[in-house]
């Protein structure tokens, strides 16, 4: 690819991630520098932009984004470090048609992942918001996989990668957060907003009924 076009793609990726992180930060999805985002530039070889580690998502600087390969290694010389969970993003890109990945930590997704962890998944059914996932079926039902929050991030990435279901654009990590993806930034944002809406509703139903058996 000509250098000029490559630089244009890189700048687009930076712009997309900066815009997206501010929008989601303003929704309260990135407390205490948590979470990360990425945007794919190329499939073969896999190259994607990912937010750098430990940065406040509510601000924009020239050190917020780094470009990495499928092994999570920087493709250019840099002093910046990619997010510690970059390999989860890589597995998602390798196993799905994702063009953008979003990872957020919220009270609702932590609650749901804790309550349903022993089941290995959380069932969601009969909610209108499922349509936001491009699932248009009567009595629609989906299952979001839940994996343990391994301290070893390599192990975490491997287990999350194994759990990925290309038909359901999300994986939950127990008392940690959710990874959502879409074919582009618009779809990924829509998906994460839909899941967070459904998890908040489910949390309230569990509390109201006094049971996790809400369906």
Swiss-Prot record:
Family matches, as Gene3D superfamilies: Class II aldolase/adducin N-terminal domain (3.40.225.10)
GO cellular component: cytoplasm
Catalytic activity, as annotated: 5-(methylsulfanyl)-D-ribulose 1-phosphate = 5-methylsulfanyl-2,3-dioxopentyl phosphate + H2O
Top-rank EC class of the record's enzyme: lyase
One annotated GO molecular function: methylthioribulose 1-phosphate dehydratase activity
The keyword Zinc belongs to this UniProt entry's keyword annotation: yes
Cofactors named for this entry: Zn(2+)
GO biological process: L-methionine salvage from methylthioadenosine
Key words, A-Z: Amino-acid biosynthesis, Lyase, Metal-binding, Methionine biosynthesis, Zinc
Family annotation (InterPro entries): Aldolase_II/adducin_N, Aldolase_II/adducin_N_sf, MethylthioRu-1-P_deHdtase_MtnB
Cofactor annotation comment: Binds 1 zinc ion per subunit.
Signal sequence bounds: none
Binding site for Zn(2+): 103, 105
Pathway it works in: Amino-acid biosynthesis; L-methionine biosynthesis via salvage pathway; L-methionine from S-methyl-5-thio-alpha-D-ribose 1-phosphate: step 2/6
EC number(s) given by UniProt: 4.2.1.109
Function (record text): Catalyzes the dehydration of methylthioribulose-1-phosphate (MTRu-1-P) into 2,3-diketo-5-methylthiopentyl-1-phosphate (DK-MTP-1-P).
HAMAP family per UniProt: Salvage_MtnB (MF_01677)
Family of this protein: Belongs to the aldolase class II family. MtnB subfamily.
Name listed for the protein in its UniProt record: Methylthioribulose-1-phosphate dehydratase
Top-level taxonomy: Bacteria, Pseudomonadati, Aquificota, Aquificia, Aquificales
Gene expressing this chain: mtnB
